[in-house]
Amino acid sequence: MDEMSNVAKTTTETSGLTDSVLSLTKRMKPTEVTTTTKPALSNTTKFKGVVQQQNGHWGAQIYADHRRIWLGTFKSAHEAAAAYDSASIKLRSFDANSHRNFPWSDFTLHEPDFQECYTTEAVLNMIRDGSYQHKFRDFLRIRSQIVANINIVGSKQVLGGGEGGQESNKCFSCTQLFQKELTPSDVGKLNRLVIPKKYAVKYMPFISDDQSEKETSEGVEDVEVVFYDRAMRQWKFRYCYWRSSQSFVFTRGWNGFVKEKNLKEKDIIVFYTCDVPNNVKTLEGQSKTFLMIDVHHFSGNGFVVPEEVNKTVHEISDEEMKTETLFTSKVEEETKSEEKKGGFMLFGVRIQ
């Protein structure tokens, strides 16, 4: 009987102890949860070159040429990550694609062109003082004017109407240099475009094709040529002379253009030289002349102009259109004067 009493007493004490522990655990639980969920500052994030700061803001930095370069403080990690991407374009142009936080977009793909107008120090200063995005948007606005008002013609542009058919000084004019129908090898695994010699010698930068010079694997020299497409996107090609086939070719950069434009055999590539009128605003350091590359896709019914052209030309905000009235009115005037003369529409104007 005493033994049973002792067992019961022990059980009661144990139960009481257990209840006490459980009660203590329940009381401690909120404290433990609060402790584990308390945000802790970390020197690293999922973004490259971004660090969290004590005040809740985010810092951006980048390493280049064996030194750390501070890019500034930003309100969000995404802003800091974008600043890192912008800086990497200028500082790591040779492998910028492998050092990015965000994939290239229709917006950011124009950044390399924008940065070419400035020195490295100027780009870094704009990122630090917060003016980078504002100036980049100005650059895109000016570029949209070029896209919306460019005229592709075979010779000097003259307005059909107006004061005695005077030459327009408000429209951008382009002169066709040459065109080429693509062959199977141009869009095949060789990853190169052959430029006919008569055009290469006349319109492309000089590269010697002297057979007596010392040979290399592909040519004695090469240069980089820069073109813009309809959307004013920049395309860079390595231009060289292949002695093995005795041909002038585009190599590096051409394969990417083929894939982006979905080029096929029999498509036509057209090359132009374009002039920007003196009274049209450009950014400091920008040239008044540039080269353009255009694509005419082949279909069963002939050649067609890509639909995205009209989309690109007309996708301009109302506010921008108000500031561009001077330019668009000239294009509309020319279009109306040519409506009854046949031809086709290209870049918003009628071409004979």
From Swiss-Prot:
Biased composition (Polar residues): 7-20
Compartments, as annotated in UniProt: Nucleus
DNA-binding region: 46-103, 178-297
GO BP term, example: ethylene-activated signaling pathway
Keywords, ordered alphabetically: Activator, DNA-binding, Ethylene signaling pathway, Nucleus, Transcription, Transcription regulation
SMART domains associated with the record: AP2 (SM00380), B3 (SM01019)
Entries under InterPro entries matching the protein: AP2/ERF_dom (IPR001471), AP2/ERF_dom_sf (IPR036955), B3_DNA-bd (IPR003340), DNA-bd_dom_sf (IPR016177), DNA-bd_pseudobarrel_sf (IPR015300), LEC2-like (IPR044800)
Keyword Transferase: no
PANTHER family associated with the record: AP2_ERF AND B3 DOMAIN TRANSCRIPTION FACTOR, B3 DOMAIN-CONTAINING TRANSCRIPTION FACTOR ABI3
Function comment: Probably acts as a transcriptional activator. Binds to the GCC-box pathogenesis-related promoter element. May be involved in the regulation of gene expression by stress factors and by components of stress signal transduction pathways.
Family (UniProt): Belongs to the AP2/ERF transcription factor family. RAV subfamily.
Protein name: AP2/ERF and B3 domain-containing transcription factor At1g51120
Organism per entry: Arabidopsis thaliana (Mouse-ear cress)
